[in-house]
């Protein structure tokens, strides 16, 4: 939406995106992007200035580059069908990842400027990737966001849902906290990882 790719949410289906046009998303201006997402920043500012946040920490959220890339190029949830043809178009994936890196950093900065005290990076579809593709699609682009956020003196939580090796992810990407999915043994992961661990609860329990 913020990058001029149409999106709508359909009941029992999820997000449905329009055609990805590189010439359109690469020409998006920062001012227009921020204006489209201004309701997010205004809400964070409203919450941060209210008494509800006394002794509480406000978390800002961004989608990870890989998960956003999947939605933008697959044009729908990959849960039932992932079009893997885009793995073959290196130029397109490179260019889209560059655009995402630029505007995710803008999105992070605006959330922080309006009161977010922690940033959480959601990678809902990290588990779709094979080990050989992790450095290009997940480790490098996520590390860029983590380093940028830390440079603003803001801690980072990462949630690479379904990733095969949380230990490797933490050692490479270096988040301050890792969020695990409910299929991971929290006792085992707590022994392997030397940073705070959260999550691990089946959504059905909630």
Where are these regions (language model features)?
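Catalytic-face loop-and-helix region of soluble metabolic enzyme cores
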Residues: 147-206
